[in-house]
Amino acid sequence: MIRKFNREGYTWDGVDTLVYKQDNSPFKDVTRQVLFDGAWDIPCQFRYFEVKPGGYSTMERHEHTHMVMIFRGKGQCLMGDTVEDVQEGDMIEIPKLMAHQFRANQGEHLGFLCLVNVDRDKVQVITSEEQAMMKQNPAIKAFLESE
């Protein structure tokens, strides 16, 4: 099967553009497209997330590792106690149980491909108490206050 890419809308033929999450997790201006949802011999899900300028993904952690490749634009990624600038083409490995978040805080869309196991644990949203502790790091404080 081939799913043709539409560069204008950053969508793929036959793939629905969905709300990022349905579980009331905190996020802003993020959509999700599931490009591949597993097969018997490839038990992974391949997804595309698009964050509008000023938006951000949920700050979370989980038991599973996942791989992310920046596909569009630039922004920043929080991983544990560090904040990194990311741009198109960058590959990111997010280890299990590492707090992480993506922000489109560079005036552009931030689109990324994400590979995870089909069978995986549920995310653990980083609590406001944990975020308050993390904000003691000036770089993380600036990241969390950025748009």
Regions found by a protein language model. Name each.
Residues 57-59, 77-78, 94, 100-106:
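Short beta-strand His + acidic residue motifs that chelate non-heme Fe in jelly-roll/DSBH
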Residues 48, 93, 107-125:
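A short hydrophobic beta-strand segment most commonly corresponding to one strand
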Residues 64-66, 70-75:
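Glycine- and acidic-residue-biased ligand/ion/polar-headgroup-sensing regions
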Residues 1-43, 127-147:
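A short, N-terminal "cap"/entry segment at the start of jelly-roll beta-barrel domains
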Residues 55, 63-64, 82, 98-99, ...:
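A generic "binding-loop/recognition-motif" signal
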Residues 81-96:
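Short acidic-glycine-tyrosine-enriched beta hairpin
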Residues 32, 47-62, 96:
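Conserved short histidine dyad/triad with adjacent acidic residue
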